[in-house]
């Protein structure tokens, strides 16, 4: 269509943030200021540190006719009644199998339209649960990556209708099988092109890696309540606690 949409912030007359964009921008600014100060111990010429994000969008595809027969799906985006299917994800055969041709057609159409909008989608594959799939982009600056994810979810619904599908983005639409997570892979980089969480070839670079790793671990330890706050909604709480990633606790794993 001919509409021009652009992200904006929403604040009150007295300056309080009334949306999700303003707190994100403030958080990114705080990370930039703190990380730049630490960088000056190693690289005095660094002027800015950028937070990069690579999200993973998981989703279920359901045939439109089957979707229309389920009022719970229509009203809530998840099943509220019924019985578990005879076959779920016991053998992981969907995860390691080929993508159905009809789904591939949807994915290709989605990717073309996403790229036309500047969304750098890169991967497509099956997920663990039956009829569950995933797409993921190349890393971007975090603020832009969040905008692109919101835009992609809206685009997915429109493209799915063209192919006779309904997209389910609820965290746990079906009982007994995996739900859909939105994993956030993030990193910090400088305006001079240095990946701060990457190991280096010199002792100085490795010291920088250790320092930023320790700072990240300490941040998780001190502020785990704040990290949990934005994801503690009913849908996500319903999904977590089984064998899915991540678990229902905050943890740090160094690989």
Name what the model sees in each region.
Residues 1-169, 174-255:
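Glycine-rich, acidic/polar active-site loops that bind/position phosphate-bearing ligands
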